[in-house]
Amino acid sequence: MKSAEIREAFLRFFEEQGHTRVASSSLIPNNDPTLLFTNAGMNQFKDCFLGAEKRAYTRAVSSQKCVRAGGKHNDLENVGYTARHHTFFEMLGNFSFGDYFKRDAITFAWTFLTSDKWLNLPKEKLWVTVYASDDEAYDIWTKEVGVPAERMVRIGDNKGAPYASDNFWTMGDTGPCGPCTEIFYDHGADIWGGPPGSPEEDGDRYIEIWNNVFMQFNRTADGVLHPLPAPSVDTGMGLERISAVMQHVHSNYEIDLFQNLLSAAAKAIGCSNDGQASLKVVADHIRSCGFLIADGVLPSNEGRGYVLRRIIRRACRHGNKLGAKGSFFYQIVAALAAEMGEAFPELKSQQAHIERVLKAEEEQFAKTLEQGLRILEQDLAQLKGDVVPGDVVFKLYDTYGFPMDLTADIARERELTIDEAGFEREMDAQRERARSASAFGMDYNSLVKVDTATDFVGYNATEGQGKVIALYKDGQSVDQLGEGEQGVVVLDRTPFYAESGGQVGDTGYLQSGAVRFDVQDTTKTGGAFLHHGVVASGALVIGSPVEAKVDADVQHATSLNHSATHLLHEALRQVLGEHVQQKGSLVDSQRLRFDFSHFEAVTPAQIKALEDIVNREVRKNTPVETEITDIETAKRKGAMALFGEKYGDTVRVLSMGGDFSVELCGGIHAKRTGDISLFKIISEGGVASGVRRIEAVTGAAALAYLNAAEEQVKEAAQLIKGNRDNLIDKLSAVLERNRQLEKQLEQLQAKAASAAGDDLSSAAVEVKGAKVLAARLDGQDGKALLALVDQLKNKLGHAVILLGSEHEGKVVLVAGVTKDLSSQLKAGDLMKQAAAAVGGKGGGRPDMAQGGGVDVAALDQALALAVPFAEQGL
């Protein structure tokens, strides 16, 4: 059976047993901040097991995509070198949430594995383990299923503590836990290894293929196990492992799925497919990289993005080792999509995006890979001992982009290890330098601790009545704020919107008789709204009733920009692809700023398309609608939730243009899209690896921007004696004339330099048989000096030359040494001395070097270094 057939058979079998087929969740866990990546089938059902979530079904089956590369579960260093380690794998699983328990779970597993209708595995090839004291499971296996006692193994607490066992699963020190039973396949006597529980169990003969976890207890802090009222079942069977069994091969890399990827990798690299470890690395890594990018991860220098970057660069290095010329890794995506795209459609729908991301990252790394490898080889050649020093590992990481595990990989191939502790010390030192160089701001919200909550009434009003329930000055609770004092006011109810979701907090004022408090910002801590500002008149005391008035004009302008970000978000997904995710935003009354995931600059044509889409929705003038509902209903309606945001039981769904944009949002918005009037993008750029930023304006600000641009066009036209109709033609003519004049100037400078060369050659002095020339030629740029040094080397024949110039307020230096002297005297060394003398830097080849500096007054002193330099070296 092919891997795809096994996957489908598993899902279909459990559907016939009353299970609901549930799609694989994203590799980015959305309900567990403790996880870097989804690494087990049960991750998406965690809240079901904990009783925090109720679903419409109590039996589920899935084929879950998983990644283990980074954090606690890190298989990266072993991938490619063993038969069963992978960065990406599929976990087949069936689950019961308080429905069936041990008897059914065991029967289901045995039936699927051994029935001639399903996998039809030989029963005599299967071994079973149970927790030592789990007599119930043991009896089901032996008395009901019929597994002989000689193929049953009881596993006790083999990890040094009560319930610390390979056959006892825990979610943590406390909480749900229970015994598990595992099914092993015997690959045969020709492979070394012993049954589970034996001294030889680490061999490859007996391989675990299916684990059934029985969650039947709740462990309390005192270590006591209490029976759960509704026991559950969590099972997992690796698709790659069971495929190897069904296809009668021992290594996962020999199954059909990997054979196709290995062939594609060999073709892309241009090498043979002979089972090399490096080829296995590439074939494995294309799966994890492809799926991670499809799920929204982009290469970066932190978090999930850095793990992805490490995997990509490891694959590139192994491809380079196999002789790859140019970019190759992205070429394997098509084979991955063909192999797994039916089961995981995101691979096909995002194939082009995955290819672009991989190619861009590969090309970026190629710029430093060869140089970094050369530096590493030089360091290894001088290595004494078998440990690569931590400072070398750090240099490769910091300068050439080599992740630590990539250097460890290379060291391993040479039977060396790396000094991880030394590397971490270097990293700590770098982090400390970064901390020392940064300026810290104080989070005023963290200083204010408020137990009460504020009732927000600002969705439909910009003013209202409230009562002062707390006052703060310098983070301390006070009874009153006097005139001129800055502080924070907390009301029992307020129309002021608190900064959230990228939208800035409202401004305005609070009035209580003759007392006025000017609100300069509004933030939130817990459920309390904090009105930051200053007392303009009188004294504000706790208990005072106030009239709260928001600056409605500012809020309205802000709301237009906020609504525009929603339209822009959807437009970005339409123009750039569904991989686009919001990474941050800032919305105020003047403009909007929107950060999003994307791997390359947005082109001018794409900018125009974005503006066209948003302005089309603006012109439709459709109502902006809100609805309060539960999170699951919102998701079913297609509402987009921002990754990493915390949502309560009820959420606010904001719809614009019908179903054009549907997002969860608690902000203040326009009433209709037409209120935005006009949308104009004013800038686009990168803010971090894999993150782009667009800034835009709307309404009156957009009109003002366009009017200013129109004035600039008029002024430019006047400067070149044209008008807006012939501006481009006129400007092109001016630029062409400028190019011609620059060319003529270069020719004149070359003639002048040649004439100067004739004059300068006679000024050379002789030092130990060589000619040494140092001269100052103000007004000449570096290009002219380089040409002159070449000319002088030909004329002088056996010489050391140093030329300097004051050019545009700075020093330009060029040094040259004829080739017959370059083994004794190096132009780069002379340049370092001369450039340092003028407060700058320089370097180059042994025969030619360039540099410069800012200290024009020291230029003559720098030129005077040429003669002593020659005297010392000759």
Swiss-Prot record:
**Chemical reaction(s) catalysed:** tRNA(Ala) + L-alanine + ATP = L-alanyl-tRNA(Ala) + AMP + diphosphate
Q: Which UniProt keywords apply?
A: Aminoacyl-tRNA synthetase, ATP-binding, Cytoplasm, Ligase, Metal-binding, Nucleotide-binding, Protein biosynthesis, RNA-binding, tRNA-binding, Zinc
Asked if the Swiss-Prot or TrEMBL record annotates the protein with the keyword Cytoplasm, the reply is yes
Cofactor binding note from Swiss-Prot or TrEMBL: Binds 1 zinc ion per subunit.
Tell me where in or outside the cell this protein is found: Cytoplasm
One MF annotation (Gene Ontology) recorded for this entry: aminoacyl-tRNA deacylase activity
| Residues that, per the record, bind Zn(2+) | 562, 566, 665, 669
- What is the enzyme's class at the highest EC level? ligase
The record's listing under PANTHER family reads:
ALANINE--TRNA LIGASE, CYTOPLASMIC, ALANYL-TRNA SYNTHETASE
The free-text function statement in the UniProt record for this protein reads: Catalyzes the attachment of alanine to tRNA(Ala) in a two-step reaction: alanine is first activated by ATP to form Ala-AMP and then transferred to the acceptor end of tRNA(Ala). Also edits incorrectly charged Ser-tRNA(Ala) and Gly-tRNA(Ala) via its editing domain.
The Swiss-Prot or TrEMBL record describes its family as follows: Belongs to the class-II aminoacyl-tRNA synthetase family.
Q: Any idea what this protein is called?
A: Alanine--tRNA ligase
Species of origin reads Pseudomonas putida (strain W619)
Gene this protein is translated from:
alaS
